[in-house]
UniProtKB/Swiss-Prot annotation:
Belongs to the beta/gamma-crystallin family. SMART domains: XTALbg. This is Gamma-crystallin C. It comes from Rattus norvegicus. Residues 2-40, 41-83, 88-128, 129-171 form the Beta/gamma crystallin 'Greek key' domain. Residues 84-87 are annotated as: Connecting peptide. The keyword Transferase does not apply. The modification S-methylcysteine is found at residue 23. Crystallins are the dominant structural components of the vertebrate eye lens. InterPro entries: Beta/Gamma-Crystallin, Beta/gamma_crystallin, G_crystallin-like.
Amino acid sequence: MGKITFYEDRGFQGRCYECSSDCPNLQTYFSRCNSIRVDSGCWMLYERPNYQGHQYFLRRGDYPDYQQWMGFSDSIRSCRLIPHTGSHRMRLYEKEDHKGVMMELSEDCSCIQDRFHLSEVRSLHVLEGCWVLYEMPNYRGRQYLLRPQEYRRYHDWGAVDAKAGSLRRVVDLY
């Protein structure tokens, strides 16, 4: 069970809304989000309703203003509780439709270019666990939640291009 609290103002002030499950539309509960407290679980937040737009991965902790979660604005319109699993495994492909060179991964990877000599990933197959793909090395840039399924093209995980810099397993460390 997860628990996240959204606050309209910085520093955990103003109107707040507590959530414990996926919510495709948070607009009815608050108009802006400037701080967040994650009491339990790992969460993916989305800039727009129905799990669209920029994505922000948060684990347990306090985020006193939106820059703390690398937000571009105070707009959070949907959220998803990420299920915890024990093992993680995925396959990266250099070409669409799971073609070309394939690399398998079961641990975090801070730099895909250094490890696999790839700057772009055109398709993925997440076999176990949930992952966050970052467009830049060292877990920076745009973030994309990857759940167990096949992603035949980078559009399938919500990206605008095939840039892939780093990958991190979703693990609740507490």
